[in-house]
A protein has these predicted regions:
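Phosphate- and other anionic-substrate recognition elements at nucleic-acid/protein interfaces
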Residues: 1-165
Length: 165
């Protein structure tokens, strides 16, 4: 890894029906900021506004998103529309955009394309125990919705995936 890659700052955003999760990674693997933002009304416009504020505040070199158009990825039309608007916003701000498929993410974190989100979250909680261990949701029951905190782990995974490729 070259010196400039070690010093760069990444903003990774994981979109969901709840809102979005985010992670800011600096240097090799320093988790500077992370969290999730729940958006209840006017989801796309409000999500876009929050993400723009994060770009202005964090001044990342790269924006990392999940590739919503990758083979095998099923995302709601609203999420795909928001994704396009975020890419346009980033390009308008001359920000490099990297898109990573869910398959690539699982391959890097689990060495297995068929792994599940809970397994990825557990790996990330071990990698960043001080930051993420207390936010690790319990294993989801089949009849329950995914915990909104999973968006944080998705975002951290996206950032690490880009950093380590």
């Amino acid at each position: 890894m070259n010196q400039s890659a070690k010093q760069s700052r990444l903003l990774a955003v994981s979109l969901s029906t709840w809102g979005f999760g985010y992670a800011v990674l600096e240097g090799e693997n320093s988790l500077v900021d992370y969290g999730n933002k729940r958006i209840n009304t006017d989801k796309n416009a409000r999500s876009l506004a929050h993400i723009e504020k994060m770009i202005v505040h964090n001044q990342p070199d790269v924006l990392v998103l999940q590739d919503v158009n990758a083979k095998g990825t099923h995302r709601a039309p609203r999420i795909k529309q928001l994704h396009r608007k975020i890419v346009a916003l980033a390009k308008n701000r001359k920000l490099k955009v990297v898109e990573i498929s869910g398959t690539e993410l699982r391959r890097l974190l689990l060495n297995n394309e068929d792994g599940i989100k809970q397994e990825m979250a557990e790996v990330l909680a071990k990698k960043f125990p001080d930051e993420l261990a207390s936010r690790l949701p319990e294993k989801r029951k089949a009849w329950k919705s995914e915990d909104a905190r999973m968006d944080i782990f998705d975002a951290v995974g996206l950032a690490l995936n880009h950093r380590n490729t």
